[in-house]
């Protein structure tokens, strides 16, 4: 048996929500160890960036090339967090007038959908870097270990600890488990 890696919190999924969760916990006084376990090659999850192998410097933000914040309750913590990202040049307002889906251009003013309500933002760099930049906001970034290209295939809760097993046989133990990946809805997750 491979000796398990031991953490206070194990997070499955390396997208924006995982990075915000980790950063917020450290800011609120948490000082334990966190593992972010991601099936992809880097942070970002559905907000990631593809780099061309043939055209150096060419990037495509896909999945979620931008994001919007609908803060109808005027949540001060959310406002402060977004303002910090703006002040530190991590994000900027998305002033795009058009959205293109499946080759059809749609004017923003024509969209009547809750997913487009609120302020739209884009990463100043790439969407993959957005998650890493959010992690970099906290001074405890060294308390986070990353496991990329690591697919969790089994979860068990034994003696008040989560035991996670990856496809390659690595085991992770943690007091707490956060499942942030939208792949929880995927067919392969039903087997867990």
Residue ranges and their predicted role:
Residues 17, 42, 184:
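Conserved Rossmann-like nucleotide-cofactor binding loop
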Residues 66-76, 107-137, 147:
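Short beta-strand to alpha-helix junction loop
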Residues 187-192:
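Glycine-rich beta-alpha-beta "Rossmann" dinucleotide-binding loop(s) and their flanking helix/strand
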């Amino acid at each position: 048996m491979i000796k398990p890696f031991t953490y206070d919190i194990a997070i499955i999924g390396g997208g924006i929500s995982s990075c915000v969760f980790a950063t917020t916990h450290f800011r609120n006084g948490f000082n334990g160890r966190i593992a972010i376990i991601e099936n992809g090659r880097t942070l970002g999850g559905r907000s990631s960036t593809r780099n061309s192998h043939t055209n150096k410097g060419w990037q495509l933000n896909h999945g979620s090339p931008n994001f919007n914040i609908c803060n109808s309750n005027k949540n001060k913590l959310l406002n402060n967090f977004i303002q910090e990202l703006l002040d530190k040049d991590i994000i900027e307002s998305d002033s795009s007038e058009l959205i293109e889906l499946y080759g059809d251009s749609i004017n923003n003013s024509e969209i009547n959908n809750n997913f487009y309500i609120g302020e739209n933002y884009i990463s100043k760099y790439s969407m993959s870097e957005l998650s890493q930049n959010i992690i970099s906001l906290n001074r405890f970034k060294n308390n986070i270990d990353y496991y990329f290209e690591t697919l969790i295939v089994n979860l068990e809760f034994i003696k008040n600890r989560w035991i996670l097993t990856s496809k390659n046989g690595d085991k992770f133990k943690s007091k707490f488990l956060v499942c942030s990946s939208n792949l929880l809805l995927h067919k392969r997750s039903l087997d867990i």
